[in-house]
């Protein structure tokens, strides 16, 4: 059974567009559910607009893939060719399947989430930088996001990839606000199956020390910087 289902609409027919492609995908899900048992994501296109999303995504959550190989200078050219060459090159496709599609919860329902192109390429670079830092000065760098661009999920994807790259390291997430600590912890907790471990919030500096004592691998722990002043 297919891992990806693609629905194409003719650009020469004015009566059909990418919204019709999305509607057709939803029809397939209702009429041929077995086609989507192993589905990773879907693609809809009328050649003018091409987007990818998961079976739980609304039309507004299908996203363009704006670069073939991570070169942001080409990111303004989001088209059919860029998405297919960017997402379906064999090694990148395997990476997407293995570390950039996760399940979470929204309004009490399970949703499947596909990484956006900027998350995919930024996480790869961040992990490479972290590996170099581990061998040199310990400075991995800054992973910068604009508001609303999915930083919480980027951190989840980063943690997943880092687990494989560094043989299951222990990860401590430090923030400077209680609300942000709770937000990030909540996102990681919703993705615990994807991460194959349950994150833990440290209640105090002593608790964090206890969680880390004697640990040689695994574990994702959350704390705030203020706890170090207690």
List the model feature ranges, each with a label.
Residues 1-170, 179-195, 216-220, 226:
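ATP-dependent helicase/translocase motor core
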């Amino acid at each position: 059974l297919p891992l990806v289902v693609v629905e194409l609409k003719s650009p020469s027919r004015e009566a059909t567009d990418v919204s019709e492609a999305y509607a057709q995908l939803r029809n397939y899900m209702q009429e041929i559910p077995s086609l989507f048992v192993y589905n990773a994501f879907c693609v809809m296109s009328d050649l003018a607009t091409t987007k990818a999303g998961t079976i739980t995504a609304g039309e507004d959550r299908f996203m363009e893939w704006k670069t073939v190989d991570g070169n942001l200078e080409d990111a303004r050219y989001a088209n059919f060719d860029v998405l297919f060459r960017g997402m379906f090159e064999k090694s990148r496709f395997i990476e997407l399947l293995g570390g950039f599609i996760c399940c979470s919860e929204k309004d009490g329902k399970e949703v499947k989430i596909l990484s956006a192109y900027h998350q995919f390429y930024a996480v790869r670079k961040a992990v490479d930088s972290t590996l170099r830092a581990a061998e040199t000065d310990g400075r991995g760098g800054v992973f910068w996001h604009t508001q609303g661009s999915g930083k919480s999920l980027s951190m989840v994807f980063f943690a997943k990839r880092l687990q494989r790259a560094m043989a299951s390291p222990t990860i401590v997430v430090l923030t400077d606000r209680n609300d942000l600590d709770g937000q990030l912890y909540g996102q990681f907790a919703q993705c615990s199956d994807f991460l194959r471990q349950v994150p833990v919030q440290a209640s105090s500096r002593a608790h964090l020390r206890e969680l880390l004592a004697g640990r040689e691998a695994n574990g994702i722990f959350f704390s705030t910087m203020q706890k170090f002043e207690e």
